[in-house]
């Protein structure tokens, strides 16, 4: 007879519930089972261990004499197995949480940003209670979305400041490239001129980093608040098509390296949770990956020949896949937060960058610097390849025209010089003949060779 053994792993702290990563396996005929030693803490803070073995054997079930043969026993046990996994999904317990035997109080993870996470958790519960009071369905799911919107609105001024600083740096890039080309090889001079340019334009290169650093504790606190709520087992309700906000896995399972055990290995050709629940849980990671790619396509910077930028864009292409993989190993409540935050971030960036919501944070005296840099960039790097081809053709035509004009000018100068030289040769010949005719002495005249003109010398040298 077949039996079903359910045993809790050693990382589970004193809870009688089953973790999502608990093993559910079928073995051969016979009884017996496996026991795991489970640590827990008593009231005096001493660590004890206890063993737990859950055995379900068909040998212990009496025969069914009065049942009809049409009853599907396999379907009954399949439903029981699904129920066990549903209970396991609800029992999301953090790896660093300790459950005492008396009060069952959960120790929350906080760290440096514990006060922020406590405040976020309090606001989340208030939002959930308020939505439940007005009979809004899926109260916890909508509470997560509302809390994300509130935090995003609170950090909007910092985001705007960061975008304005980034736009100012982008406007100065043509001038910075001109400095790098002018002082190529002299790194010290490049740094000096660049810092002088920043000072003249009133731009601080570090101004774009400070708002981002300021928002990091807020988002870490929100993440920890959602993790604490999941660890407390409060994400038991579903959200539209999602069976449970605490499923399909837990924070503890992710930290132990078994965050995707709900997907693999397959049991009898189907995933452990069944096809319906598995597909329902996979919708959020797929939506998260799709939203990441849409955001990257909308905010994609203009293409350049910079190899560093090409390598960065290549890395960013695989980033959504990594985020989707992380979404497989956390509760669905955190995936809803990630998806909402990504959609809101994309909307903010489109408004600030594309629709003119943010203006470059620069002094008015920097307008001439920016216009000069843009003019150089437009001349040196035309945006369209066809425009560059037309410029080259026009330049070639102008060069040919200049050569033709220069050639005509040279020919005219040569003709005028040849005419003046021929006139001077005729006058010299007449003077020589007159001198010979007027000579009355018998003294022989010296032989005078034929005199070559300057034009003949010029032709010979050419």
UniProtKB/Swiss-Prot annotation:
Main location: plastid
Lumenal topological intervals: 57-130, 227-232, 300-317
Pfam families for this protein: 60KD_IMP
Residues covered by region (Disordered): 393-462
Topology, Stromal side: 152-205, 254-278, 339-462
Transmembrane segments: 131-151, 206-226, 233-253, 279-299, 318-338
Tissue expression notes: Mainly expressed in organs that contain green tissues such as leaves, flower buds and stems.
Presequence boundaries: 1-56
Membrane topology label: Multi-pass membrane protein
A biological process term (GO) from this entry: protein localization to chloroplast
Oligomeric form and interacting partners: Homodimer. Forms a complex with CPFTSY and the signal recognition particle (cpSRP). Interacts (via C-terminus) with CAO/cpSRP43 (via chromodomains 2 and 3) and with LHCP. Interacts with PAM68, SECE1 and SCY1. Interacts with TERC. Interacts with ALB4. Interacts with STIC2.
Domain notes: The C-terminus (339-462) is required for interaction with cpSRP.
Function description: Required for the insertion of some light harvesting chlorophyll-binding proteins (LHCP) into the chloroplast thylakoid membrane. Required for the insertion of LHCB1, LHCB4.1 and LHCB5 proteins into thylakoid membrane, while it is not required for insertion of proteins PsbX, PsbW and PsbY.
Name of the molecule in the record: Inner membrane protein ALBINO3, chloroplastic
